[in-house]
Amino acid sequence: MEIKSDHSEHGFQFPGTFELSAVGTAGKALETELPRLLARCGVELVQERISWKHSSTGKYVSVRISFRALDREQYDAAHQVLRDHPEVKWTL
């Protein structure tokens, strides 16, 4: 069964600008490595919307990256690249 919406504002719209967050171990250069990996997988990064924040204990870092994806395949590939990194604990 396929679910479709009559309203275009529902769900993902492609092409579009999206944001992914990844949390991983601090001190592993994830702040620079994760954007580089996304760029390599073919998505266009929104450079001014890349940010990171360290946890209160300093043990973890959350990296937030905005990017443009042409289609769902490109979006899914970007998400997978982040998930595949050995230092990434989880993604949103």
Swiss-Prot record:
Gene3D superfamilies: 3.30.70.260
SUPFAM superfamilies in UniProt: YbeD/HP0495-like
One Pfam family linked to the record: DUF493
Record-stated family: Belongs to the UPF0250 family.
NCBIfam families (UniProt xref): PRK00907.1 (NF002066)
Listed name of the protein: UPF0250 protein XF_1271
Record organism: Xylella fastidiosa (strain 9a5c)
